[in-house]
């Protein structure tokens, strides 16, 4: 008692068309002309089973259409995101932006502190200059008063 041989079933990895399975499901002895037609049409060799057994080949199931990536990224970032979907690229970019923002804020605060210091130093130098000028002016007045006493020759100064 021999059991009838069952046809082998495989999954066609490269085929995305369903029309290629009809000629492959028939036996090789009865469909040589159909197989040649199929080979010429699709550019493949016909599948020949071992011992003349029919071989049934199913195409891979089609997946749902790929979702379109929509973002405000430029194309290179979008391509990087598409090729590395499980990467933490967005987190890295956000982290890098935070670090850059922090550095920028530190530079701005340091610049503001420097401006304040320079402003205070400028005010200090201006005040020092003015006091020195007032001191000189006062000393010149005293000297001029003292020298005018000797130069008056008895003429009283105007009142």
From Swiss-Prot:
Biased composition annotated in UniProt, kind: Basic and acidic residues: 38-47
Alphabetized InterPro entries for the sequence: C5orf52
Positions with biased composition (Low complexity): 14-35
Superkingdom of this protein's organism: Eukaryota
Region Disordered, residue ranges: 1-57
Compositional bias ranges of the Polar residues kind: 1-13
Name the record gives this protein: Uncharacterized protein C5orf52
Species the sequence originates in: Homo sapiens
Gene: C5orf52
């Amino acid at each position: 008692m021999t059991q009838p041989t069952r046809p082998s079933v495989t999954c066609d990895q490269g085929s995305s068309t369903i029309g290629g399975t009809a000629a492959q499901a028939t036996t090789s002895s009865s469909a040589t002309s159909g197989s040649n037609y199929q080979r010429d049409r699709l550019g493949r060799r016909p599948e020949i089973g071992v011992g003349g057994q029919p071989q049934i080949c199913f195409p891979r199931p089609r997946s749902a259409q790929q979702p379109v990536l929509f973002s405000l990224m430029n194309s290179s970032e979008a391509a990087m995101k598409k090729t590395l979907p499980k990467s933490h690229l967005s987190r890295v970019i956000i982290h890098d932006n935070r670090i850059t923002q922090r550095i920028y804020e530190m530079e701005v605060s340091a610049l503001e502190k420097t401006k304040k210091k320079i402003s205070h130093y400028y005010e200090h130098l201006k005040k020092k200059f003015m006091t020195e000028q007032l001191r000189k002016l006062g000393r010149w007045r005293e000297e001029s008063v003292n020298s005018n006493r000797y130069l008056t020759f008895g003429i009283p100064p105007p009142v």
